[in-house]
Amino acid sequence: MTGTSNIPTHGKEHKDAPALLPLPAPNTHHTHAAHPGDPSHDRHPSRGKLFIKTHGCQMNEYDSAKMADVLTTTEALELTDNPEEADIILINTCSIREKAQEKVFSQLGRWRALKTNGRDVIIGVGGCVASQEGETIVKRAPYVDLVFGPQTLHRLPDMIRARREQNRPQVDISFPEIEKFDHLPTPRAEGPSAFVSIMEGCSKYCSFCVVPYTRGEEVSRPFEDVLTEIAHLATQGVREINLLGQNVNAYRGAMDPGPSNNTNPAPPPYADLGLLIRAIAQFESIGRIRFTTSHPLEFSDSLVEAYRDVPQLANHLHLPVQSGSDRILSAMKRGYTALEFKSKIRKLRAVRPDISISSDFIIGFPGESDTDFQKTMQLIKDIGFDQSFSFIYSRRPGTPASNLEDHTPDEIKRTRLEHLQKHINAYAADISKRMIGTVQTVLVEGPSKKNPNELTGKTENMRPVNFPGHPRLIGQFIDVHITEALTNSLRGRVHTN
């Protein structure tokens, strides 16, 4: 297997996705608060300003957006990008790496001065560091007022009120499963692409990872609830849906059994990711579907069939492999071999020959030898990965891997990482260059940040494209002729037949 066939092409032919279920009406969403755009919300003047800083993954970005929705709706707060003028300051944290965790306390130290000038500023810490550290955060930084986990962000209004009434810090890092989604305001679109969380947590317990301990085990949102949220977003002009989960392809959403008889058999008790993708594809206005992040163990034949049958499913897959060495994969408790990983990619490319594959790699895992690293490099050559997130192993307290002996010098780890990144960057650059002259379907997201007179969007394989165009194209899928490949983006022009 090689990576020489993964240049995306325009006009893929796939079978039509089968009809599935009646789509939900948008007004069935569970909510306990008015939408910020509703007249009932507009009657309330702003009661202060809210600043949110986000560290980490796309799940955290999604959660931060929901924090903003909750507090701008229920508390009539106004968002600001300046913490010095905020009445409530929240930091949504990541604990996947040690440096990310220390950054949190450095940031909190800088905000401490904002509470010394007589202003009643509330500082809150959410996310995975909050789940991991809990009340230790308040002990280390006693000026922190709120500590809340990813599953309790919907309780922020109550926590803020309790903090003001009781004049003491509030800590809630419990795991109330999927409760938070029933208490969030109506989803609010901010552009033509939107994230939708379909599950929380992870039950794989990889030896290096803190996610099961900070976000809990896997819990999937009910099938109809996910479709209802997407229905709301579709009415607001969203054209692309990004499905989120720590282990998104382990999705098992409960389905409403409904009436059944001999001629109308009951649906299965749950929907997997493949079935969910097919259902989303029934929304006429949704032109592209993505999902992240996946686990190779859960990359099923059902998902391969969705790639075969659903043209709206983007021609790109991010599938973290972490290592090409079976010995290291076993120590990581990943549950698969390099050969099994390649077999899954082979099945996928049988139905999508030009799909681009990106991945994650951990370099310098305890005990990694030169031979182990060379097996990783061979896997990279065999697959032809297009882009990666690659890091030197970071020891996380409380994980099984933290007890493993590590005798590899840091200098060797850095050299290996640079070598790996150099090769993957070369593969990615080659793919970008081979896209010159092709026509790509691009979702126009808005004005280019580098040149406001141009537009920007993304190809199916996640490459930003900048091109001249009229603002009326924003929010539409258009064909773009690629004219130039730069280091981190492409340039093009609107394609006309």
UniProtKB/Swiss-Prot annotation:
Annotated [4Fe-4S] cluster 1 binding lies at C57, C94, C128
GO function terms (MF aspect): 4 iron, 4 sulfur cluster binding; metal ion binding; N6-isopentenyladenosine methylthiotransferase activity
Region (Disordered): which ranges?
A: 1-48
Superkingdom of the source? Bacteria
**Domain Radical SAM core per the UniProt entry, residue ranges:** 188-430
The UniProt record lists the TRAM domain at 433-496
Catalysed reactions listed for this entry: N(6)-dimethylallyladenosine(37) in tRNA + (sulfur carrier)-SH + AH2 + 2 S-adenosyl-L-methionine = 2-methylsulfanyl-N(6)-dimethylallyladenosine(37) in tRNA + (sulfur carrier)-H + 5'-deoxyadenosine + L-methionine + A + S-adenosyl-L-homocysteine + 2 H(+)
Q: Which SMART domains match?
A: Elp3
Q: What is its EC number?
A: 2.8.4.3
Where is it localised? Answer: Cytoplasm
Q: Where is the MTTase N-terminal domain?
A: 48-165
- A Pfam cross-reference name: UPF0004
- Co-factor binding comment: Binds 2 [4Fe-4S] clusters. One cluster is coordinated with 3 cysteines and an exchangeable S-adenosyl-L-methionine.
Record's keyword annotation contains Metal-binding: yes
* Stretches with biased composition (Low complexity): 18-28
Q: How does it assemble?
A: Monomer.
Q: Which NCBIfam families match?
A: miaB-methiolase (TIGR01574), MiaB/RimO family radical SAM methylthiotransferase (TIGR00089)
Quote the PANTHER family the UniProt record gives.
CDK5 REGULATORY SUBUNIT-ASSOCIATED PROTEIN 1, MITOCHONDRIAL TRNA METHYLTHIOTRANSFERASE CDK5RAP1
Q: What does the sequence similarity comment in the record state about its family? A: Belongs to the methylthiotransferase family. MiaB subfamily.
The protein here is known as tRNA-2-methylthio-N(6)-dimethylallyladenosine synthase
Instruction: Please name the source species.
Output: Xylella fastidiosa (strain Temecula1 / ATCC 700964)
